[in-house]
Amino acid sequence: MSGFDDLGVYYSDSFGGEQQVGDDGQAKKSQLKKRFREFLRQYRIGTDRTGFTFKYRDELKRHYNLGEYWIEVEMEDLASFDEDLADYLYKQPTEHLQLLEEAAQEVADEVTRPRPAGEETIQEIQVMLRSDANPANIRSLKSEQMSHLVKIPGIIIAATAVRAKATKISIQCRSCRNTIGNIAVRPGLEGYAMPRKCNTEQAGRPNCPLDPYFIIPDKCKCVDFQTLKLQESPDAVPHGELPRHMQLYCDRYLCDKVVPGNRVTIMGIYSIRKSGKTSTKGRDRVGVGIRSSYIRVVGIQVDTEGTGRSAAGAITPQEEEEFRRLAAKPDIYETVAKSIAPSIYGSSDIKKAIACLLFGGSRKRLPDGLTRRGDVNLLMLGDPGTAKSQLLKFVERCSPIGVYTSGKGSSAAGLTASVMRDPVSRNFIMEGGAMVLADGGVVCIDEFDKMREDDRVAIHEAMEQQTISIAKAGITTTLNSRCSVLAAANSVYGRWDDTKGEENIDFMPTILSRFDMIFIVKDEHNEQRDMTLAKHVMNVHLSARTQSSSVEGEVDLNTLKKYIAYCRAKCGPRLSAEAAEKLKNRYILMRSGAREHERETEKRSSIPITVRQLEAIVRISESLGKMKLQPFATETDVEEALRLFQVSTLDAAMSGSLSGVEGFTTQEDQEMLSRIEKQMKKRFAIGSQVSEHSIIQDFLKQKYPEHAIHKVLSLMMRRGEIQHRLQRKVLYRIK
């Protein structure tokens, strides 16, 4: 196969020089270098009317004067100047990129003269390449593309520390002290094969032994290099397959340009290196011709923050005009809500809340350096069969960056970050988890209630501070996880039981308070609704089409995905003065309980909201403004945000299911629970036991509600004061 990256075999009869090249080959190289030099000198942009500028000549001069010894060349510019040169660079990049760098060094020498004293020696120039061609996929790389230029997108999941690699080495014989200098080492991850014999012949001296040479470190010329691990994008992974990885090699100015979690598009040379040796004897013969693939990077484009795969730069002017018209529609909010999972009937408020989550609020950086998150977190609790998982699956496809995980199959390290040992350097490196890979997008966590409590605690920091702090194996760092969390969970009893109240939920208050909206999804028995739902499901199954049965005026999935990415990239609304005043007044009313008193005439219930919930309403208002591409969130947006908060979190709190969450408990309930607990402790002493049925009946005769009695019993069991015995019929007092 042509173009194999060999080991740089050293010929002992050509000491001190590079590989001998024939006159024809040398002349061809000189000719190609001259054409590259002409391209860098003469390529210009502009018109006769506006005037011409020499693009690369001016760039070289500007970068060199700033001490940046690199230049970025666009392949399209090279192809328009000389198509043969671009073809050479695509098909044989290893040889021709070196010629291009030598040509760039000569042009830089010309344009920077005269240089100041002490800087007479011209520095080497690194040439980086970029292209607007459509990227390939890691899975599509085959042996035919070996040693060709390739362009692939993906996510950086690991990065090693920057190390040094020799480009020119000097070697010396241990026996006769013969020194050979300035030996070129091939770029990339391949090493250099030392000569086995010393050919220096001196009269009266015995021949030097085998393997006499060693490297003189002080006389070597080194460059920085770094290896990265690239994982293919989640949307490019076929269903049911594992995402594939590729090792990347970066050197010089390409080092330290990316961190784990960055979405990048790589331009590089598809290369091979020798596989690691097997330890078992006799098996080396099997893998003698097998090589491991890697990519030698020659250009990196990092996707802009928060826009991900549907980068705003890829949006055409026609699409931008269409988005402006879409945002100007008076019913854009309803249109977007209808476009979310159109195959699912009903759940209009949940779809509107998901629309707010997809667009997100505005992230704020305060003067003291602290940040306020702009992403909206949403939790759906309730009965099975209410399309919670289907909504999560749709959001994963609809979001510009979406990662879907299930609670039981997710560990703390898999969600946040893990530390592992690099097989090459044996140093510890860090690999980002789901919440790092979803930076700028949405993490969908299904079966949230099935997660282990230890794993659920790991995402506390990621949900509120939007960072993940790691202190393991000598690595102390912080990764960004600026993503929304959309979670779905079932109740403890499978179906929602209104009589059980808080017992339906087995979540800590600390995790519940981090969700901006909490929806309780109930499968209510309503004949008219059941008839409509059954008809809708039958239409979906019979016609296998959702568009015919869904409402008019919705946006298709691809347009919606691009529109969300465009709004997130271009718009960052703030609350208007009138909206802020209105929200402040309503917040005071809700804190005092006046609004609850107006809504409920039978009894006065005080359900205060805290500053965390106030910030949630601000974020929802900003997302409604962002949906319309407005610079400010208006009073109408605040009204709708308050309504969404009312039908989600406040209604859940009213049902008693969120008591204990950030003050979501009435004063009367707390007093009643403490009275029941005191009487229960008086009823039976420590070490005694009593029938559970009889004690519940005694309290029911005293007109206490049954759910309050069960709540006290569960609280005492959780604290370890009582326990069940004899098939859960008897209560035994421990302390």
From Swiss-Prot:
Gene Ontology molecular function terms on file: 3'-5' DNA helicase activity; ATP binding; ATP hydrolysis activity; DNA replication origin binding; single-stranded DNA binding; single-stranded DNA helicase activity
Binding positions (ADP): 372
Keywords linked to the UniProt accession: ATP-binding, Cell cycle, Chromosome, DNA replication, DNA-binding, Helicase, Hydrolase, Nucleotide-binding, Nucleus
GO annotations of cellular component type: chromatin; CMG complex; MCM complex; nucleus
Catalytic activities: ATP + H2O = ADP + phosphate + H(+)
Subcellular localization(s) per the UniProt record: Nucleus; Chromosome
Superkingdom, taxonomy of origin: Eukaryota
PROSITE patterns reported in the protein's UniProt record: MCM_1, MCM_2
InterPro entries assigned: MCM (IPR031327), MCM5 (IPR008048), MCM5_C (IPR054125), MCM_CS (IPR018525), MCM_dom (IPR001208), MCM_lid (IPR041562), MCM_N (IPR027925), MCM_OB (IPR033762)
Ranges spanned by the short sequence motif Arginine finger, renumbered to the chain: 513-516
Domain named MCM: residues: 332-538
SUPFAM superfamilies noted in UniProt: Nucleic acid-binding proteins, P-loop containing nucleoside triphosphate hydrolases
Single GO biological process annotation from the record: double-strand break repair via break-induced replication
Record EC number: 3.6.4.12
One Pfam family, short name: MCM5_C
Similarity comment: Belongs to the MCM family.
Function field: Acts as a component of the MCM2-7 complex (MCM complex) which is the replicative helicase essential for 'once per cell cycle' DNA replication initiation and elongation in eukaryotic cells. Core component of CDC45-MCM-GINS (CMG) helicase, the molecular machine that unwinds template DNA during replication, and around which the replisome is built.
Subunit text: Component of the mcm2-7 complex (RLF-M). The complex forms a toroidal hexameric ring with the proposed subunit order mcm2-mcm6-mcm4-mcm7-mcm3-mcm5. The heterodimer of mmcm3/mcm5 interacts with mcm4, mmcm6, mcm7 and weakly with mcm2. Component of the CMG helicase complex, composed of the mcm2-7 complex, the GINS complex and cdc45.
Protein name per the record: DNA replication licensing factor mcm5-A
